[in-house]
Amino acid sequence: MRIQVNAKGAARLLSRHLWVFRRDVVSGPETPGLYPVYWGRRFLALALYNPHTDLAVRAYRFAPAEDPVAALLENLAQALARREAVLRQDPEGGYRLVHAEGDLLPGLVVDYYAGHAVVQATAHAWEGLLPQVAEALRPHVQSVLAKNDARTRELEGLPLYVRPLLGEVPERVQVQEGRVRYLVDLRAGQKTGAYLDQRENRLYMERFRGERALDVFSYAGGFALHLALGFREVVAVDSSAEALRRAEENARLNGLGNVRVLEANAFDLLRRLEKEGERFDLVVLDPPAFAKGKKDVERAYRAYKEVNLRAIKLLKEGGILATASCSHHMTEPLFYAMVAEAAQDAHRLLRVVEKRGQPFDHPVLLNHPETHYLKFAVFQVL
């Protein structure tokens, strides 16, 4: 059995993009699985396939293989081998072991938290392979949890569930990140439990010192904890009371009495702080993905600009703005244009301190732009 694509679908795969949409599939099997993709008689790729979803074809290999399952699992073995050194050096840390398309393992994410793995599968073909995924992880971890509760699974016709695949899965684990420790709720936390893509950026922010810092969209205090090592007072803002409870717990875990939490809508709070004349030496903005799709980009641009504008107005002269976007639809040129426009409207000048992005364990494929989603930039406000 094979998948036949039209010229447009073939062009995408020949350019080494991994995705072909259903509208560009001419014919294919009726059941999801792993299949070869052809354009006429020409072999193009091996792919995860689901005829019932818009994103029908997800390529993982551009050469034929006798055993498609073995070829996919070889990609998994290679992804784990690329992380082996860091796991030996930092077994108590938090890292991404599998980054979906970035590791040629579309629809699969595996995160590592101090000896325990959390798996999320969002492509149908992975469902029957999860026991083999757990076995591949066995040499590296004490337990494996399948946290398959993402709503995107429903688009694939898959059930939502959370259950152990291997070993005894603890409710929570303690992760060491540089000089900071934090607790991860493996079953109930957002994503797989924490936001590991900002790990290196959180560590980078430890170099700054000052009186007052503001961490907006703080979640469980990720940036706030690192900032508290160098600032007299850090204010962590989030709209979730539960997230802030965890932030306070993490602050206590580290003996940090200088972290104060505020439950509030970020946009409303930033406007209020400006009216009250509050000023900060540093502001971190780590908002959610305002642009979930292409149709959201214009609205998202306005939202990102508004929150950056308000943050810039709160900064003292010489203060530091660290700002992020985790939407791949908000491209890098758009992101920097938005920040520049926000600075212009605030009548302030920004000096680039550093442009950053995803860490090594969230690899980017140049031919597949969707893998490059995280922008993180640090500016000095003049």
Curated annotation (Swiss-Prot):
Instruction: Tell me its family.
Output: Belongs to the methyltransferase superfamily. RlmI family.
Active-site residue numbers? C326 (nucleophile)
- Which named protein is this? Ribosomal RNA large subunit methyltransferase I
Q: Where in the cell is it found?
A: Cytoplasm
Keyword annotations for this protein, in alphabetical order, are:
Cytoplasm, Methyltransferase, S-adenosyl-L-methionine, Transferase
Query: Some GO term, biological process aspect, for this entry: which one?
Result: methylation
Recorded GO molecular functions are:
methyltransferase activity; RNA binding
- Cite the binding residues for S-adenosyl-L-homocysteine: R202, F217, D238, S239, N265, A266, D286
Deletion phenotype, per the entry, is: Lack of methylation of cytosine at position 1962 (m5C1962) of 23S rRNA.
Q: Known InterPro entries for this protein?
A: PUA-like_sf, PUA_sf, RlmI-like_PUA, SAM-dep_methyl-trfase, SAM-dependent_MTases_sf
